[in-house]
Amino acid sequence: MGFEIADTEGRYIQADFGKLSIASLYLPSGSSSVERHERKWQFMHYFMEILKGYRSDGREYIICGDWNTIHQEIDIKNFKSNQKTSGCTPAERAWMDDIINDVGFVDAFRLVNSHSDQYTWWSNRGQAWAKNVGWRIDYQLITPGLKDQIVGESIYKEERFSDHAPLIIDYKDLTGLI
């Protein structure tokens, strides 16, 4: 990406197929220290400019991965008590709003699933998994041209691979873009 945080920490990878780009993002977490939170914001500011460029380059994008930020109140079990927690602050949620409302990316999961209690991350403390006290911080943000290609969604919880569960979006045949 030409951006130190992304490049040295392996936070973004993209594969291009014809007119379709599929990317994996691992946005920095800001929860471990003030310095990490500042580093997260540096990444977010830089990445916003990248996303704006993507919207004007004529390609379709699927950007999936751990965004380490919720978008809306529905995306976290304990919204009110986490307002000052990194990943749930008003400023971070506003950044997600900007990506979706101003830049024009689409939250593929929420496009087809408006139900609450749909989470992709649970703390390893306090039986969060067993009690479904989670956060939805994993996304597939897509360009609007892919909206009509979504045929299904799921969060895979049959096995635990980590503190995250895979977010799956099923698409119609995308070979016309490849």
Task: Please tell me what each predicted stretch does.
Residues 3-5, 129-132, 157-159:
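Short Gly/Pro-enriched turn/cap motifs at secondary-structure boundaries
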Residues 43-133, 137:
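Metal-dependent phosphoesterases centered on the DNase I-like endonuclease/exonuclease/phosphatase
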Residues 3, 28-44, 81-85:
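Surface-exposed cleft-lining segments at the edges of enzyme active sites
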Residues 15-18, 143-144, 169-174:
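Active-site beta-strand termini and strand-to-loop segments that position acidic
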Residues 151-178:
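Surface polyanion/phosphate-binding segment centered on an Asp-His-Pro turn
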Residues 9-14, 136-138, 164-168:
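Short hydrophobic/aromatic beta-strand or adjacent loop that forms the aromatic wall/cage
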